[in-house]
Amino acid sequence: VDNNIQTQYNFPLKPGMKVQVSREKNKHEFRHPMLKILYEDAYLIVVEKKEGLLSVATDHQKERTAQHILNEYVKRTHRNNRIFVVHRLDRETSGIMMYAKDEKTQHTLRDNWHDIVYDRRYVSIVMGDMEKDQGTVRSWLTDRKLYVSSSPVDDGGKLSITHYRTIKRANGYSLMELQLETGRKNQIRVHMQSLG
């Protein structure tokens, strides 16, 4: 539309606008050493984020984030385009992330997240030799701004459940597969620390 690539299905057209239709993919290539686009359509972008990159902006870091990088990418097709955060991954966590291209999609994905993403598994290396081959950690986590506290009884925190399986032990470390029933801030870190 008027020499701008437009993928929005309900983009409002006005008399006098020049419209061209192409079956070719968007010519704006995306290349970034910390992000790889795995899937993209008019509603969402699915990326593989490498460790070391924040997923969203913080008070201290606005630009070196997946959110900022993807915002710059979608603005190449139209200056008003932007992306919307659906979920987060910690800076030192690599994995698959999903960002919405509009607020309606963001709300739909967030409101139905546990129905859409029913299996969340992580592979992690932890210090120490795990005593058990598998088990479940169940505790109540409370975000206390500077740290997240864990309690084995309901102390007003949020119930958090992590299932774990030891894949391998070597040289004082354990390779773990972790399956989350809940997705709380720092859940994996706090639950693994509680196991010793």
Regions found by a protein language model. Name each.
Residues 1-196:
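RNA pseudouridine synthases
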